[in-house]
Amino acid sequence: MSTAISPLAPTDVPDLPEIAGVRLATAAAGIRYKGRTDVLLALLDEGTTVAGVFTRSRCPSAPVEWCRARLKDGHHAKAGLALVVNSGNANAFTGKTGRQATKLTAGIAAKAAGCKASDIYLASTGVIGEPLDATKFNGVLETLASEAAPDRWMDAARAIMTTDTFPKVATARVKLGKAAVTINGIAKGAGMIAPDMATMLSFIFTDAPITATALQSLLKSGVEDTFNAVTIDSDTSTSDTLLAFATGAAGARGAPRISRAGDPRLKAFVKAFHGVLADLAEQVARDGEGARKLVEVIVEGATSKASARKIAKSIANSPLVKTAIAGEDANWGRVVMAVGKAGEPADRDKLSIYFNGIRVAKSGARDPSYDEAEVSKAMKNDRIQIKTTLGLGKGRDRVLTCDLTKEYVAINGDYRS
């Protein structure tokens, strides 16, 4: 966790309301950091349903494997459940020791929460390859269970931070049937961000009565154009985890129970749910390690949406493009390079490129009306849009990233120090 807040941090941070059936507590367990909280315990009432999406890394962390096993058949807790998140140690690439640590953590948490170990969800973030000493949770989780309260959202968001410079929270309130329901979300992530099914860590909570199957469908569809459309450094983490919990408490106020993601009564909820995911995903991009500029990459006129996504990712992940943005240089030649290397259909002589709405290249060459002074002024903004039109079809997609600065190198060069 950095002491200097990113200049791209949101200026308007919402107060997250309480959600019936959710209680939170945090503590400093000394996992890696000193003088700050590094453990989150979330307690969820009986009847809570759960859904999750995770990294596609072939080297997943032990907590990811643990959660996947819990969700195999769609989880519905009969006696309540709990979520334990620690920062500072990813418990990844830790072999048998790591798997034993997850079992020990789940056992300690189950005793504290009064449920079964199979009703415990785990997530870890931090250094890869170092064993996690789960005995540090002894006593800590019991205390947290007794202290858990429904209004600790900001504390929860802070406890899961690593190199993040600000806590990431989002909320929405919407009608489901005749009842108002709430959606709250927290996230962390600033580096090793190129999610594939999730982000580094993100947790969504709602009081809507939704079955695990329907919630899983909502989550899978929601991440595609939110968390999966964000990249900081092209590195997909071993620990990417996005979990959603629905307590169903709004059912007592008249909210209908939803068992199908396509239920028309869910339309407003789906929009709000995706909005929370999009808000959190953008905050992750804004907090990219060392970032000074938020970058939106748009690709239009591709042969398909999938092709546009791949080209947009090629541009967004290019160190040459990202350093040019950091240097406030509208270097469209580097964008051309990134389009060309993407391995997708592209016609050089149909290519046009825009920086913040100013066309700098047209039909495969520099725009005849190019004005260096106008473009240079636009590049000083802290939000940069790069739009590329291919002229081949109707495929369009959008990816968020940030610039690449000297600070990124410094942060990651000193990460284990």
Swiss-Prot record:
<keyword id="KW-0055">Arginine biosynthesis</keyword>
<feature type="binding site">
    <location>
        <position position="199"/>
    </location>
    <ligand>
        <name>substrate</name>
    </ligand>
</feature>
<comment type="similarity">
    <text>Belongs to the ArgJ family.</text>
</comment>
<keyword id="KW-0963">Cytoplasm</keyword>
<feature type="binding site">
    <location>
        <position position="412"/>
    </location>
    <ligand>
        <name>substrate</name>
    </ligand>
</feature>
<keyword id="KW-0068">Autocatalytic cleavage</keyword>
<dbReference type="GO" id="GO:0005737">
    <property type="term" value="C:cytoplasm"/>
</dbReference>
<comment type="function">
    <text>Catalyzes two activities which are involved in the cyclic version of arginine biosynthesis: the synthesis of N-acetylglutamate from glutamate and acetyl-CoA as the acetyl donor, and of ornithine by transacetylation between N(2)-acetylornithine and glutamate.</text>
</comment>
<feature type="binding site">
    <location>
        <position position="417"/>
    </location>
    <ligand>
        <name>substrate</name>
    </ligand>
</feature>
<comment type="subunit">
    <text>Heterotetramer of two alpha and two beta chains.</text>
</comment>
<comment type="pathway">
    <text>Amino-acid biosynthesis; L-arginine biosynthesis; L-ornithine and N-acetyl-L-glutamate from L-glutamate and N(2)-acetyl-L-ornithine (cyclic): step 1/1.</text>
</comment>
<keyword id="KW-0012">Acyltransferase</keyword>
<dbReference type="Pfam" id="PF01960">
    <property type="entry name" value="ArgJ"/>
</dbReference>
<dbReference type="GO" id="GO:0006526">
    <property type="term" value="P:L-arginine biosynthetic process"/>
</dbReference>
<dbReference type="InterPro" id="IPR002813">
    <property type="entry name" value="Arg_biosynth_ArgJ"/>
</dbReference>
<feature type="binding site">
    <location>
        <position position="289"/>
    </location>
    <ligand>
        <name>substrate</name>
    </ligand>
</feature>
<feature type="binding site">
    <location>
        <position position="162"/>
    </location>
    <ligand>
        <name>substrate</name>
    </ligand>
</feature>
<feature type="active site" description="Nucleophile">
    <location>
        <position position="199"/>
    </location>
</feature>
<feature type="binding site">
    <location>
        <position position="188"/>
    </location>
    <ligand>
        <name>substrate</name>
    </ligand>
</feature>
<keyword id="KW-0028">Amino-acid biosynthesis</keyword>
<dbReference type="InterPro" id="IPR042195">
    <property type="entry name" value="ArgJ_beta_C"/>
</dbReference>
<keyword id="KW-0511">Multifunctional enzyme</keyword>
<dbReference type="InterPro" id="IPR016117">
    <property type="entry name" value="ArgJ-like_dom_sf"/>
</dbReference>
<comment type="pathway">
    <text>Amino-acid biosynthesis; L-arginine biosynthesis; N(2)-acetyl-L-ornithine from L-glutamate: step 1/4.</text>
</comment>
<protein>
    <recommendedName>
        <fullName>Arginine biosynthesis bifunctional protein ArgJ</fullName>
        <ecNumber>2.3.1.35</ecNumber>
        <ecNumber>2.3.1.1</ecNumber>
    </recommendedName>
</protein>
<feature type="site" description="Involved in the stabilization of negative charge on the oxyanion by the formation of the oxyanion hole">
    <location>
        <position position="125"/>
    </location>
</feature>
<dbReference type="GO" id="GO:0004042">
    <property type="term" value="F:L-glutamate N-acetyltransferase activity"/>
</dbReference>
<keyword id="KW-0808">Transferase</keyword>
<dbReference type="GO" id="GO:0006592">
    <property type="term" value="P:ornithine biosynthetic process"/>
</dbReference>
<feature type="site" description="Cleavage; by autolysis">
    <location>
        <begin position="198"/>
        <end position="199"/>
    </location>
</feature>
<feature type="site" description="Involved in the stabilization of negative charge on the oxyanion by the formation of the oxyanion hole">
    <location>
        <position position="126"/>
    </location>
</feature>
<dbReference type="GO" id="GO:0004358">
    <property type="term" value="F:glutamate N-acetyltransferase activity"/>
</dbReference>
